[in-house]
């Protein structure tokens, strides 16, 4: 089944800024969105892993989606993370996002309850039938302990009209190769791991859902644009420049490092919600994170 690709290029997996007293910092969120669009991104992803989805209340979800749609103002598609390990809840979140005006949905493989491949397929089919909006599957087995098998993703792409792509964060090149070799027309295959973006593009992929773009939208968009234009020499150069910072984003649990970088830039507080905790200001890990970005942008290393 052919699809209309939701985007091609970079979609930042946006952090959710919080104030020091744990409220949503809508002003910082809107500034972040403007910076991303000015940097050249092709879409926005809100309420994903990097957006601390598990600790966001239902009311806050509405506020975040409304703020993202208002700030984007039609300039790029807004994709909302609505997948959970509860199908009914995922349906409710998906319908609410579509009703608010979301352009697409990000549906993660169910975590903790570890369904069969058939169970996951039924989960997605149920969401798609209820929400009737483009769906990007999200495969991140390191977080969920569940791997979306290529044959399952391809079955859904062929049989379910709204399944329009996959964010692949398994790190499995063979799996990515299978998806790219057998996908239907218009089915997007995106890197969900910044460090894997260059190889995915070289294999014919369509872009990335990115963590590092929160702080470096322009340089990361240059990498992806070069790869999509088959200018692999330029893409390799950008990859080499960004690689230390890409790796630094995962020296502690995402989004802790990237939020600290954004805070060092003066864009937001470094606050994350429990059970995540911010890095200690004097920790060696924090120094390594900020130092990795210091060659690329002017961050304050305390």
Swiss-Prot record:
Catalytic activity reported: L-aspartate 4-semialdehyde + pyruvate = (2S,4S)-4-hydroxy-2,3,4,5-tetrahydrodipicolinate + H2O + H(+)
Homology family: Belongs to the DapA family.
GO MF assignments: 4-hydroxy-tetrahydrodipicolinate synthase activity
Pfam families, per database record: DHDPS (PF00701)
EC number: 4.3.3.7
Assembly mode: Homotetramer; dimer of dimers.
Free-text function comment from the UniProt entry: Catalyzes the condensation of (S)-aspartate-beta-semialdehyde [(S)-ASA] and pyruvate to 4-hydroxy-tetrahydrodipicolinate (HTPA).
Subcellular location: Cytoplasm
Name of the molecule in the record: 4-hydroxy-tetrahydrodipicolinate synthase
Organism: Salinibacter ruber (strain DSM 13855 / M31)
Cross-referenced InterPro entries: Aldolase_TIM, DapA, DapA-like, Schiff_base-form_aldolases_AS, Schiff_base-form_aldolases_CS
GO biological process: diaminopimelate biosynthetic process; lysine biosynthetic process via diaminopimelate
Cross-referenced HAMAP family: DapA
Site location (Part of a proton relay during catalysis): 49, 112
SUPFAM superfamilies, per the entry: Aldolase
Residue sites binding pyruvate per the record: 50, 209
Keyword Calcium: no
Keywords carried by this UniProt record: Amino-acid biosynthesis, Cytoplasm, Diaminopimelate biosynthesis, Lyase, Lysine biosynthesis, Schiff base
Entry superkingdom: Bacteria
Pathway in which this enzyme or protein is active: Amino-acid biosynthesis; L-lysine biosynthesis via DAP pathway; (S)-tetrahydrodipicolinate from L-aspartate: step 3/4
Active site positions: 138 (proton donor/acceptor), 167 (schiff-base intermediate with substrate)
GO CC terms: cytosol
